[in-house]
Amino acid sequence: MTERYAVFGNPIGHSKSPAIHSMFATETAQSLTYEAILAPIDAFEATFKEFVTNKGYGANVTVPFKEQAFALCDELSEQAKLAGAVNTLSVLADGKIRGDNTDGLGLVADLQRNLGSLTGLKVLLVGAGGAARGSVLPLLQAGIAKLSIVNRTQAKAEILAELFSSYGDVVSLPISHTGKSYDVIINSTSSSLSGEVPNISSDSITSQTVCYDMMYGKEPTSFNVWAKAQGAKQTVDGLGMLVGQAAESFNIWRKVRPSVEPVLTQLRAEL
């Protein structure tokens, strides 16, 4: 029987998830369907439950429903609990709903694909919203030496650093702090969508720094253009993170890990 999967969001028309999972299914010879479902802002839970009733096996969840998805789960992975949000829902054999968060795993996989091992690296995380929160534990588990978090509102960065303090060396700093350089700088904010750049000091970047923007587009993002102008060694956008988190979700559902590279190459060509 062909099993049914979907991505829920609002808006959702722009989603690349159906194309990604269709390519994964072809590559791994899995029989499934994957569609995009527009859920009303005030009716995510009802829309998802209708999907489950109609033989839905699993789903991805995007903006603005990740916290609502978290709330409806019967079981949660450790990563989902700490992220406070769910992007992957699985319908278990007993009908219970399990929630996972694969966003940070997708980020780490893409960083490792571009950099190799992350062990011992000093990382600056810009932003303290949901995307940042979902990334902290996977980064620490990948072996980074220290994670510094900055945010326009420093109190939010402080809360995040405190939440993960028992998992590794995590600190919060003023966004405009100077005198520190990093191996990797990750922009988790959506600043590039409006052509802006976070107010971080250019001396955070050296000729050995890799800068990563979670946003992506046909042209380099505004953050990556700025980082390159400051002399960054390498800039990477978030398209690989998108494909990586999808691969993690696919593996949770199908117990088979698809190859990211061919899908990423095709998506890049289609931007």
Curated annotation (Swiss-Prot):
Q: Which Gene3D superfamilies match?
A: Leucine Dehydrogenase, chain A, domain 1, NAD(P)-binding Rossmann-like Domain
Per UniProt, which keywords does this protein have?
A: Amino-acid biosynthesis, Aromatic amino acid biosynthesis, NADP, Oxidoreductase
List the SUPFAM superfamilies hit by this protein, alphabetically: Aminoacid dehydrogenase-like, N-terminal domain, NAD(P)-binding Rossmann-fold domains
Q: Which CDD domains match?
A: NAD_bind_Shikimate_DH
In this protein, the active site sits at: K66 (proton acceptor)
The reactions it catalyses are: shikimate + NADP(+) = 3-dehydroshikimate + NADPH + H(+)
The record's listing under InterPro entries reads: Aminoacid_DH-like_N_sf, NAD(P)-bd_dom_sf, SDH_C, Shikimate_DH, Shikimate_DH-bd_N, Shikimate_DH_fam, Shikm_DH/Glu-tRNA_Rdtase
Task: Mention any Pfam family matching this sequence.
Answer: SDH_C
Identify the residues that bind NADP(+): E78, G127, A128, G129, G130, A131, N151, R152, T153, Q154, A155, K156, M214, G238
**EC number(s) on file:** 1.1.1.25
Which family is annotated? Belongs to the shikimate dehydrogenase family.
Q: What PANTHER family does this protein map onto?
A: BIFUNCTIONAL 3-DEHYDROQUINATE DEHYDRATASE_SHIKIMATE DEHYDROGENASE, CHLOROPLASTIC, SHIKIMATE DEHYDROGENASE
This chain belongs to the protein called Shikimate dehydrogenase (NADP(+))
The gene from which this protein is expressed is aroE
